[in-house]
């Protein structure tokens, strides 16, 4: 198997998207397509998977030790990028993107490359609607917030039902797994789960398909190599929306 090396890059800009989310822009562009991810090496800490939000950027939510270490870095510091890895979104025909929270990161690239006709963006509150101004310039954007501070007062799933999902050829989805599971349920009800393309997040050790830590029950498909994007009909009978696994392989309820 051809091993993709980790490439050192310099952080050229850090954009605070919200109190807990930052975009790290780096000195090199990678041939990433929407949905591709990379393994990010944080010196002295760990190597973690992150989706590309641009061909020279990742957008990160601070959730643990590794991301906390990343947030401690400054412009001019170096990190390692191994990628692009995995498969990506492969939209055909009329395409809708549905994003929740930091799940907007890989779908941002889809929109900026002109591959999304319509976009549904959700967050808890207005200040957490990632890239909303940029997305409004390149696609037909509708927003939903849990607290009603911007756009629809409610969830992206409510906007999805109103959008007639069966009328789209492709529906690209990324966000909290509970949200994505609800989107899949809507597509099942509409009789078109195969139109959904879902970007999954699983614990990864290697990112290149060797260790098996990111395999999906019961198919054995590897999120890092066979994914991270899967169609709804492929994951419909998996653990998707029920549980993930931690570093030791133990189940963690969603």
Range-by-range predicted roles:
Residues 68-203:
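FNR/FR-type flavoprotein reductase catalytic core
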Residues 221-226, 230-254:
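Short Fe-S-cluster ligation motifs
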Residues 46-54, 86-94, 224:
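Short, Lys/Arg- and Gly-enriched loop/turn segments at beta-strand edges
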Residues 1-77:
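Ferredoxin-reductase
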Residues 106, 177-178, 200-229:
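Local cysteine-cluster metal-coordination motifs and their immediate loop/turn environment
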């Amino acid at each position: 198997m051809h091993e993709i090396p980790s490439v050192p890059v310099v952080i050229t800009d850090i954009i605070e998207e919200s109190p807990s989310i930052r975009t790290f822009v780096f000195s090199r562009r990678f041939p990433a397509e929407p949905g591709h991810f990379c393994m990010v090496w944080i010196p002295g800490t760990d190597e973690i998977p992150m989706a590309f939000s641009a061909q020279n950027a990742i957008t990160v939510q601070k959730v643990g030790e590794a991301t906390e270490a990343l947030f401690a870095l400054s412009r001019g510091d170096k990190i390692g990028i191994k990628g692009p890895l995995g498969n990506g979104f492969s939209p055909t025909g009329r395409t809708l993107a549905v994003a929740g929270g930091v799940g907007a990161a890989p779908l941002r690239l889809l929109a900026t490359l002109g591959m999304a006709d319509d976009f549904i963006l959700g967050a808890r509150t207005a200040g957490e609607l990632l890239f909303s101004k940029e997305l409004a310039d390149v696609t037909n954007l509708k927003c939903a917030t849990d607290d009603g501070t911007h756009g629809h007062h409610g969830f992206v799933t409510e906007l999805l039902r109103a959008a007639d999902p069966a009328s789209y050829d492709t529906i690209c989805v990324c966000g909290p797994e509970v949200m994505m599971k609800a989107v899949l349920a809507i597509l099942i009800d509409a009789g078109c789960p195969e139109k959904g393309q879902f970007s999954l997040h699983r614990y990864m050790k290697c990112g290149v398909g060797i260790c098996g830590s990111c395999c999906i029950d019961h198919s054995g498909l590897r999120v890092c190599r066979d994914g991270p994007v899967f169609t709804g009909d492929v994951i419909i009978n998996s653990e998707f929306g029920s549980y993930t696994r931690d570093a030791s392989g133990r189940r963690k309820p969603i």
